[in-house]
């Protein structure tokens, strides 16, 4: 006859002993099934002097593993390259590229600032680079603090990997900067091959 306490211990060993259950639960809670799944990295930006920058659409982007609040991250982007800002996203393929970049450089901390913020409790999100708000891929139920000053800045990879969330702007996160390639390439200059 098996005692009920023994069954509990046996279940604990089976579920937690291998670590697989905890890994699966963490992945479920995070909204993903396999963070390390292969993804398609974008091509290098190929602008001379800009290593670790990748071409995503018409911009070059770079991941920065230096947690800053939203405002400091935006200003840090501006110091890296003339005309640079926190990244804006305009189609799903570009969103996927950004996710791949984050996975490559910091697979254990996927949360990053995007260059989006809510304009004065209006419920309208804008990109810091002034580009059109023509794409969004929010986590279910987000943004959930519109018309307040609680969470006015946008992040990626909070609860569902590859999706967005509104968060408090003072929170420190890693981030991705972007600049328009044509702003750096001067007429007659050559791209690095």
List where the protein language model places each region:
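Extracellular, disulfide-bonded carbohydrate-recognition/adhesion ectodomains
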Residues: 1-193
């Amino acid at each position: 006859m098996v005692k009920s306490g023994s069954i509990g211990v046996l279940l604990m060993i089976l579920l937690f002993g291998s670590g697989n259950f905890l890994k699966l639960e963490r992945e479920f809670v995070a909204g993903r099934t396999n963070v390390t799944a292969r993804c398609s990295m974008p091509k290098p930006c190929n602008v001379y002097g800009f290593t670790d920058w990748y071409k995503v659409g018409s911009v070059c982007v770079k991941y920065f593993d230096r947690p800053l609040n939203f405002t400091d991250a935006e200003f840090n982007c501006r110091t890296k390259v003339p005309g640079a800002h926190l990244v804006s996203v305009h189609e799903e393929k570009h969103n996927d590229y950004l996710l791949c970049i984050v996975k490559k450089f910091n697979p254990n901390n996927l949360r990053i600032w995007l260059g989006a913020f809510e304009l004065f409790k209006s419920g309208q999100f804008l990109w810091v680079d002034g580009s059109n708000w023509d794409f969004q891929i929010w986590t279910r139920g987000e943004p959930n603090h519109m018309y307040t000053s609680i969470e006015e800045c946008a992040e990626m990879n909070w609860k569902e990997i590859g999706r967005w969330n509104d968060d408090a702007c003072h929170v420190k996160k890693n981030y991705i900067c972007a600049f328009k390639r044509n702003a750096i390439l001067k007429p007659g200059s050559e791209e690095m091959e």
